[in-house]
């Protein structure tokens, strides 16, 4: 069972909802479980510090927030996580910590929840002090002593005297804070403090290696220093001897808790004669009496001390290199294990062969395709056999003759059957379009049908300018004339044809409009009756008659008898014999019109009175209606064949 508390799970869930993966991982790494932070969480946070799009201050603030918890486990694990990121994370993290004024304010931390809380609170206060000192050291020298280059050409070995005397005390302060942790093997009783001790142990080795190289550089330059510098140098060396004793005790504790002996360096102390030589040199600079000593003896003592310190530094370096090598071997072992696991997974999968049998899907598909596919876009081959036109598919027409046409595709024949103008040539289409004008008269016998199978003669001209588009050119019976109005335009215009032969070969130049339809005697289809309320039918005569009757010309009064031979009584609506009447200039004796419904003022502009009305004369008085209630705007009538609807002017 996991040792995570309910509070840890709730906190992690809250960060999951907010979408902060970094904060969630911080909570996972600092749970109430009494064990060190898990490696997967630490590795994730380390990778986050290497990503440029990760907010480092937010990560640090999340860790600082966890240190405010009352549980010693959460606080201790927060410090361990921070220390781990400072050592193995990107340098940006420690740079941010060094730029902060305050870090961990845990000098008064105390967990009173239990006896173990009291004991661990002491180490938490010491541990937080070391981390604060580590950040301060980076702020002062702008680099981490545990990561500097070491060796003969290292940072501490090549540093000048002035900078060296300022840098070594900083290392001493950080070393003091580390050694103040002062833990015994009996106190390393849980996984949390053990994880902290391992980080401190690695820091102690690297920090003491830098410290040792700084002392070697100091001893090499000691006899060439000024009096004040020699005094500072002697004080630094004495402190170094004290720290060496304490670091030896720290390493003994590490050996007791089970750390490998090969990972613990051997510390070789310098001979005691070196300290006497340094003191005598300082006394000589101060003018005091000293024992007689030759330069050769001083050089021998100095060389022995440097060699012993160099061996210590070499041991520390070997430990560090051994640690790096162990880390590399661990990574290689993990990579090898992953490769072996991958190979096992691939070996378990069956090998697929390229020469496999046909799939059942393709086999079934081959069985279904019993008929060859038809390409509707391909050009059909010519055939000598004459196929019957498909116009009698629904038995709509009974052709009386079959025109001699070129063999065409089925789609073209169907289109020609229903009067598709695209199936004809350009000349035929151009010849058919003017016939759609109701003012032009042309005998149906003059139309020559010309059908070509050449696709290149296709024209984009479409009969969109027809007056009544979209009506089905199906044969219908001659509609009965209305009882109110009996108009025969064909007899009036003089171009009525009695013998009209309908071309059933598949082409109708007018689409069934503007021509009377003659039903064949062989047709057995039921006659489609036009509903009485239909305003527009397939025949122009009945359509115009219905429109004129529904418009209610003449104040809505229905005229039962219309005599077209009385031009003086009515106006002609059109035709080839229609002539506009010119009003006489001597007298205004017009026919009596309907009673006026409105009056026009004398200031009405010319041409605004009505359609087809002459302009108002200034000398003719206009009779107005005294009972006028409102003025109605005059609009142009939508029917050009009828009289103007609305108000009329009556002249006296």
Curated annotation (Swiss-Prot):
Which parts of the sequence carry N-acetylserine? 2
Carries keyword Lipid metabolism? Answer: no
| Residues with Phosphoserine modification | 16, 20, 303, 315
Q: Which keywords are on file for this protein?
A: Acetylation, Cell membrane, Chromosomal rearrangement, Coated pit, Cytoplasmic vesicle, Endocytosis, Golgi apparatus, Isopeptide bond, Membrane, Nucleus, Phosphoprotein, Proto-oncogene, Ubl conjugation
Where does the source fall among the domains of life? Eukaryota
**Renumbered residue ranges of the record's region Disordered:** 559-580
Tissues where the protein occurs: Expressed in all tissues examined.
Task: List the InterPro entries hit by this protein, alphabetically.
Answer: ANTH_dom, ANTH_dom_sf, AP180-like, ENTH, ENTH_VHS
Spell out the residues of the site Breakpoint for translocation to form CALM/MLLT10 fusion protein.
Answer: 648-649
Q: How does it assemble?
A: Binds to clathrin; involves primarily the C-terminal sequences, but the full-length protein is required for full binding capacity. Binds phosphatidylinositol 4,5- bisphosphate. Interacts with PIMREG; this interaction may change the subcellular location into the nucleus. Interacts with AP2A1 (via its alpha-appendage domain). Interacts (via N-terminus) with VAMP2; VAMP3; VAMP7 and VAMP8 (Via N-terminus). Interacts with LC3/MAP1LC3A.
Instruction: Quote the disease note of the record.
Output: A chromosomal aberration involving PICALM is found in diffuse histiocytic lymphomas. Translocation t(10;11)(p13;q14) with MLLT10.
- The protein's name: Phosphatidylinositol-binding clathrin assembly protein
